[in-house]
UniProtKB/Swiss-Prot annotation:
Induction: By fungal elicitor. Induced by the bacterial pathogens Pseudomonas syringae pv pisi and Xanthomonas campestris pv alfalfae. Belongs to the NmrA-type oxidoreductase family. Isoflavone reductase subfamily. This is Isoflavone reductase. The keyword Oxidoreductase applies. Pathway: Phytoalexin biosynthesis; pterocarpan phytoalexin biosynthesis.
Length: 318
């Protein structure tokens, strides 16, 4: 669906930003990316490196070859940020968890520029107005919720993108710590394994984000990505994998009490990942009814989008 909407991605070389850039180019949008002069930090702790192997430098080269318009700047440089925003119609922030509160600077720049049709703040997870998460992720979700309130108070046009569980974080290893591939012998399951979760590939997040960006119906609404074939319990996910490898895994179920204890006693990234897994697999933070007045279910709004199913995704690991 080609469109003349000019889209600016902030955080274009991050785990999800890269996929939004690629989806924007594929959709035919004039695509802009704000990049800093500084090289990527190879020592920066990452949650799942295997899901995003490209370096910043490789991505920049790739973007140039695709025709992405690279703008030099930084969200901490108000003047260059305003200048970049004035060139586009839609701003999508894909900054990482450590920069959530810095989005007030983007909001200020958008207000000054005065031309933005829609702002997507950095969310790309569960709905931060509907969760029972624990620390250390709770603070991040609360920061995202506070940014929502600032956006609304300032009258900035917005779309919130709630995509829940990236396959690169939750599915490629069946939510097991210290491995990047699905287990073939034993598997640990948090809770009873019967709580529904919502899985989506990072590439499909990019696709749905750009569809939502180009859709006028998403103005001042939240878009929820809960794809029918990927709305699965952990037990269902494991059953898919067992069928593929022709083997039944030895299962260990961990109580919520023990999970909370493990979170408190672990360091990053284990505590963060466990808290994310706890949110989806035990508390069921992907299970809720949407309000049509302010919510849009992506699979219903864009039924023509062909997405990667959890079953298909796991084929690469057989």
């Amino acid at each position: 669906m080609a469109t003349e909407n000019k889209i600016l991605i902030l955080g274009p070389t991050g785990a999800i930003g890269r996929h939004i850039v690629w989806a924007s180019i594929k959709a035919g949008n004039p695509t802009y990316a704000l990049v800093r002069k500084t090289p990527g930090n190879v020592n920066k702790p990452k949650l799942i490196t295997a899901a995003n192997p490209e370096t910043k430098e490789e991505l920049i080269d790739n973007y140039q070859s695709l025709g992405v318009i690279l703008l030099e700047g930084d969200i901490n440089d108000h003047e260059t940020l305003v200048k970049a925003i004035k060139q586009v119609d839609i701003v999508i922030c894909a900054a990482g968890r450590l920069l959530i509160e810095d989005q007030v600077k983007i909001i200020k720049a958008i207000k000054e520029a005065g031309n933005v049709k829609k702002f997507f703040p950095s969310e790309f997870g569960l709905d931060v107005d509907r969760h029972e998460a624990v620390e250390p992720v709770r603070q991040v979700f609360e920061e995202k919720a506070s940014i929502r309130r600032v956006i609304e108070a300032e009258g900035v046009p917005y779309t919130y993108l709630c995509c829940h569980a990236f396959t690169g974080y939750f599915l490629r290893n069946l939510a097991q710590l210290d491995t990047t591939d699905p287990p073939r012998d034993k598997v640990v399951i948090l809770g009873d394994g019967n709580v529904k979760g919502a899985y989506v590939t990072e590439a499909d997040v990019g696709t749905f984000t750009i569809r939502a960006a180009n859709d006028p119906n998403t103005l001042n609404k939240a878009v929820h990505i809960r794809l029918p074939e990927n709305y699965l319990t952990q037990n269902e996910v494991i059953a898919l994998w067992e069928k593929k490898i022709g083997k039944t895994l030895e299962k260990t179920y961990v109580s919520e009490e023990q999970v909370l204890k493990d979170i408190q006693e672990s360091s990053f990234p284990h505590n963060y990942l466990l808290a994310l897994y706890h949110s989806q697999q035990i508390k069921g933070d992907a299970v809720y009814e949407i309000d049509p007045a302010k919510d849009i279910e992506a699979s219903e709004a864009y039924p023509d989008v062909t997405y990667t199913t959890a079953d298909e995704y796991l084929n690469q690991f057989v």
